[in-house]
Amino acid sequence: MQDKEFKIAIIGPENAGKSSIMNALFGKYVSLVSEVGGTTKMPIKRYWGKLKIGRIKEEPEFVNLVFVDLGGLYTTTDKQSPIMTPKVLEKTFEEINDSDMIIHVIDGSVGLLRSFERLHHLLKFRYQKPIIVVINKCDLLNDSDKEHLKNYVERRIKNTPIFVSAKTFEGIPELLDIIIKYLKR
């Protein structure tokens, strides 16, 4: 019997830290990172590893965990990214459609963009995909800013975010735990 593939697409605006989060999840450099927005154009797919998810000892069930780093659909000023040509946009939405789960990355220093709020609702209700909302760059936020952003995100998209820092690895183990718990449910 062939192991199933469980694909997780990482989405967010340009420079939100999607590639950095992917690198942090892998514990090594697997996706190009740059200060310049639009570095990731075509989706970058990486095999994370095999996870045992079955509970039956005699017939263990495994899943191949795959992460897909997608280019930023929008800029931090809420405009469509210039890298999103029709071909790139089509490939990006193919990957989103084929994914089993979404990690929606919000840049903590910018906040939730209206365009991503709309995309979040589309993914949640039309595609009915599980979505983990991640607020990156939490190392740049004080406790008051974190609380305000958390409340705003919960109110706007009805999803409790987790705070991570791809730079300091804060929250990365918790993100992996959430993914693994979802798979083992």
From Swiss-Prot:
Q: Per the database record, which ranges form the G domain?
A: 17-137
Molecular function per GO:
GTP binding
Cysteines engaged in disulfide bonds, as pairs: none
Where along the sequence do coiled-coil regions lie?
none
> Which CDD domains does this UniProt record tie to the protein?
Era_like
Q: Name one Pfam family in it.
A: MMR_HSR1
> NCBIfam families, per this entry?
small_GTP
- Name under which the protein is recorded: Uncharacterized protein MJ0920
The scientific name of the source species is Methanocaldococcus jannaschii (strain ATCC 43067 / DSM 2661 / JAL-1 / JCM 10045 / NBRC 100440) (Methanococcus jannaschii)
Organism classification, top ranks? Archaea, Methanobacteriati, Methanobacteriota, Methanomada group, Methanococci
